[in-house]
Swiss-Prot record:
Belongs to the universal ribosomal protein uS12 family. PROSITE patterns: RIBOSOMAL_S12. GO terms for biological process: translation. This is Small ribosomal subunit protein uS12. It comes from Chlamydia trachomatis serovar D (strain ATCC VR-885 / DSM 19411 / UW-3/Cx). The gene is rpsL. InterPro entries: NA-bd_OB-fold, Ribosomal_uS12, Ribosomal_uS12_bac. NCBIfam families: rpsL_bact. Signal peptide: none annotated. The keyword Ribonucleoprotein applies. Part of the 30S ribosomal subunit. Contacts proteins S8 and S17. May interact with IF1 in the 30S initiation complex. Transmembrane segments: none annotated.
Length: 123
């Protein structure tokens, strides 16, 4: 416990804040290549098979990215756009793949929240 004089001489240092998406290196998105596409099971109490992809980014770093929406066309060697955003029930998944960009197709027959899934406006 410091004395008052010690605190006057040198203020308390705040701890360094941890970055939420360090692999993007302050970019909004980064391009990457899918190394493998798999499913992961969420932690308790949820139950599902969530689609994820191991991606090597253009800066050489490898991350696990979540593939949102129903159905996808991704496979090994697909070029994808990755943005930040974690998946709460999948430990270690801190990135999302942008649907409708590069090799990742948009979600078909999507009526609501279309911009998140790259779907065009229905006629």
């Amino acid at each position: 416990m410091p004395t008052i004089n010690q605190l006057i001489r040198k203020k308390r240092q705040s701890g360094a804040t941890r970055k939420k998406s360090p692999a993007l290196q302050k970019s909004p998105q980064k391009r990457g290549v899918c190394l493998q596409v798999k499913t992961k099971t969420p932690k308790k109490p949820n139950s599902a098979l969530r689609k994820v992809a191991w991606v090597r980014l253009s800066n050489g770093q490898e991350v696990i990215a979540y593939i949102g929406g129903e159905g996808h066309n991704l496979q090994e060697h697909s070029i994808v756009l990755v943005q930040g955003g974690r998946v709460k029930d999948l430990p270690g998944v801190r990135y999302h793949i942008v649907r409708g960009a590069l090799d990742c197709a948009a979600v078909k027959n999507r009526k609501q929240s279309r911009s998140r899934y790259g779907a065009k406006r229905p006629k």
